[in-house]
Amino acid sequence: MSGSTGERSFADIITSIRYWVIHSITIPSLFIAGWLFVSTGLAYDVFGSPRPNEYFTESRQGIPLITGRFDSLEQLDEFSRSF
């Protein structure tokens, strides 16, 4: 229901031709832009996350797991040197 400010009702907006002309262009454009952002790898560069082939390198194939309770700092130093 419209108020006294002169705004259009939601049903009036979504049934107008102008709404669908604008949104039939913008919604697919946003989808394509997002797909290109991810598929080109730009999302990895922008957010700094490793690519799927960079999680495990040739020199480091194991999971960096801390096993010792009292020598955890030494294990962390060893893991950070392997990066």
Swiss-Prot record:
Main location group: plastid
Cellular compartments annotated: Plastid, Chloroplast thylakoid membrane
InterPro entries (alphabetical): PSII_cyt_b559_asu, PSII_cyt_b559_asu_sf, PSII_cyt_b559_CS, PSII_cyt_b559_N, PSII_cytb559_asu_lum
Regions that span the bilayer: 21-35
Annotated heme binding sites: 23
Domain of life, per lineage: Eukaryota
Alphabetized UniProt keyword annotations: Chloroplast, Electron transport, Heme, Iron, Membrane, Metal-binding, Photosynthesis, Photosystem II, Plastid, Thylakoid, Transmembrane, Transmembrane helix, Transport
GO biological process assignments: photosynthetic electron transport chain
SUPFAM superfamilies: Cytochrome b559 subunits
Cofactor binding annotation: With its partner (PsbF) binds heme. PSII binds additional chlorophylls, carotenoids and specific lipids.
Cofactor(s) listed: heme b
Membrane-topology annotation of the record: Single-pass membrane protein
One Gene Ontology molecular-function label: electron transfer activity
Gene Ontology cellular component terms for the protein in this record: chloroplast thylakoid membrane; photosystem II reaction center
Gene3D superfamilies listed in its UniProt record: Photosystem II cytochrome b559, alpha subunit
NCBIfam families: cyt_b559_alpha
Subunit structure of this chain's protein: Heterodimer of an alpha subunit and a beta subunit. PSII is composed of 1 copy each of membrane proteins PsbA, PsbB, PsbC, PsbD, PsbE, PsbF, PsbH, PsbI, PsbJ, PsbK, PsbL, PsbM, PsbT, PsbX, PsbY, PsbZ, Psb30/Ycf12, at least 3 peripheral proteins of the oxygen-evolving complex and a large number of cofactors. It forms dimeric complexes.
Family to which the UniProt record says this protein belongs: Belongs to the PsbE/PsbF family.
Matches recorded under HAMAP family: PSII_PsbE
Function per UniProt: This b-type cytochrome is tightly associated with the reaction center of photosystem II (PSII). PSII is a light-driven water:plastoquinone oxidoreductase that uses light energy to abstract electrons from H(2)O, generating O(2) and a proton gradient subsequently used for ATP formation. It consists of a core antenna complex that captures photons, and an electron transfer chain that converts photonic excitation into a charge separation.
Annotated protein name in UniProt: Cytochrome b559 subunit alpha
Upper lineage: Eukaryota, Viridiplantae, Streptophyta, Embryophyta, Tracheophyta
